[in-house]
């Protein structure tokens, strides 16, 4: 293969099963694994700095010759808990939405929900790190990833985007899929997929192994067990196609 395969994985807890599976697998020596926020995963794959990435779905069309290479994903069939719009006011009162810079898929999703499902027209503002403190009054904020755990009891109105998508379309949602920007051997892809699946099959073990010892693992184990749906099944493939068409 001419050196290790460069893999960019998302650094969030929902990806711990994938990371743990890859690190514990027989193909680990063949990988150069980096952990990044979703937007950086996408950038690396698009610009050729990584061969494979766990890419936000909204970025898939930007990858020249990109191929989804496994039947594993980061998805949800109902509430996901970690991709939410937070507000002190009901949706109809929201005037500005701060968009989390870490994933364009979630930003695109909240804009679609606002236009077609909620029927509101707020001002959209791309936020910078630390923007969570600016969520007040008629300014709402889209927060994704592990930072959302700390906000789930702090705001009067919380709109879980995967749940809202399900209410609107009747479909699950796919936040990220494994994409390669170049051909890879069948034997490598088979080993890669098997490693991901092993991690998902042992996801509570993965969370325990990767969390800091001082953190109670139980809530996070429940999260990966109940809120994240890892199979890229037919319903999720349909959801991906619909999302990319809208």
Question: Positions of the model-derived regions?
Answer:
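A conserved helix-loop-strand patch within extracytoplasmic ligand-binding domains
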Residues: 72-131, 161-166
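Short helix-initiation/N-cap motifs at beta->coil->alpha
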Residues: 32-43, 120-137
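Secondary-structure end/capping motifs
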Residues: 184-246
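Short, well-ordered beta-strand elements
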Residues: 2-11, 31-34, 95-99
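A bilobed periplasmic-binding-protein/Venus flytrap-type ligand-binding module shared by bacterial periplasmic
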Residues: 21, 82-91, 96, 173-188
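Short, polar/charged alpha-helical segment
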Residues: 11-32, 36
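Beta->alpha turn/N-cap motifs
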Residues: 13-14, 37-38, 49-61, 72, ...
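Pocket-lining segment of extracytoplasmic ligand-binding domains
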Residues: 126-209
